[in-house]
Amino acid sequence: KARPESTLTNWVADALYNQAIKVYTEPIAFAYQNYGGIRINNLGKGPVTLIKIYEIMPFDNTLVIVKLSGSEMQQFFDYMAAGGGSPVSASARYVIEAGKPVRITIHGKALDLTGSYYVAMTDYIANGGDNLVYLKDKPRLDKNVLVRDLLIKESKDKGMVKSALDQRVTLKN
């Protein structure tokens, strides 16, 4: 698993997004998966087994959606960029220049600082994990669905797991 993106982190973030739009009726901007929450470095070749899913996600985290204002989204992207990039679903893209996020897009449109967005993430992050304390008091929905179960469902729904590096997060020096 590499930064700012890898095939494994892209697959996990995309899987969370794909499953979130099935579980929730709110319009999901993107899915975020904290880098440290993915506990293996790569999937390797061959079938995705239940054991492999547990190795990826050994925690009993649930998938929640958190409502953020446009300025809070900017703060969230600032956090991700400062850490060298974080796994996001393909519906979000950003470039990191000098440790700052630029050219942030959501579903192909520039981030609207006056808008509001729903972001899918684990309850660990929504509860302030990884120093994202400001998320704790944000409006959220939690249908108590385990992230691990959603990864299992995604791998069953899609059959073969495919993921590519698509420059959703780009690091420029």
Feature annotation, model-predicted:
Residues K1-R3:
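Glycine-rich phosphate/diphosphate-binding loops and the adjacent beta-loop-alpha structural elements
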Residues S6, N10-N173:
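Feature captures C-terminal
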